[in-house]
Amino acid sequence: NIFAERTFLTQNNNREYFGAYTDVTDIVEANGNGTYTLSNLDLTSNIGAYCGSGTDFGGWSIVVIYEDPNLLLNQISLFDGFEIVSGSTADITIELGPIDVASDDLSRIGFLAWEGDASIANGEFLRINGVLIGDPPLNPNNNQFNGTNSYTGSDELWNMDLDVYELDGLVDPGDTEIIIEVGSDQDLVIIHNIITSVNSELPDATISFEDIEFICNNTVNLNYTVFNVNSTGSLPAGTPI
């Protein structure tokens, strides 16, 4: 059995919507690649009030974060919550941080969202650091949350979005946060997870010897410079060199 570690509850037009989160690392490590199923979450008796608005939807996902030593140093951050926008709510702003950005190269951001409809594109927008983004034709700039999957190219997720965007030109070296703005004049959209993968270089001392002088065969004078290039943090005091 799986029990939620955190639950999220919100309302829209006098209807309640909920989400939940729990860590299933042990299960995934034990079973590895394969097919995972979720059962015993029957809400049939509760969905009647949601049918009229077309918001009688349920879904789930597993987010897997893994390490590959052959890749560049990346900082992975998972932000979970349950933020909702629709024609009856105000636009939302989400501040993601702390994040250490060394470069926008190969930096990405992903969204897990519910209830977005492909047929409703009324005043819908997604901005990252003030820039309106999309990935047409799969994710138009005025209908980003439309039941699509950036990884497979599928447009048949039916109210579930797994969308990934490149952050080239949207983040700068030294940035410590990313600002997300989402709005909609009609379509109900629920932002459940946001995942960032940014190019991040940890503090790492590198040494350049500039002059070596031998004195009386038992004394050596060294002149050297310590570098901390392309790092997003200062070298801690006492770092061995």
What is each residue range found by the language model?
Residues 33-35, 57-63, 73-75, 106, ...:
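Extracellular structured ligand-interaction cores
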Residues 44-91:
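A short "linker-to-beta-strand initiation" element
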Residues 70, 100-103, 117-120, 230-239:
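A short beta-turn/strand-edge loop motif at beta-sheet boundaries
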Residues 70-73, 100-109, 217-219:
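Extended extracellular/luminal ectodomain segments enriched in beta-structured repeat modules
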Residues 216-234, 239-241:
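Short beta-strand elements of extracellular/lumenal beta-sandwich folds
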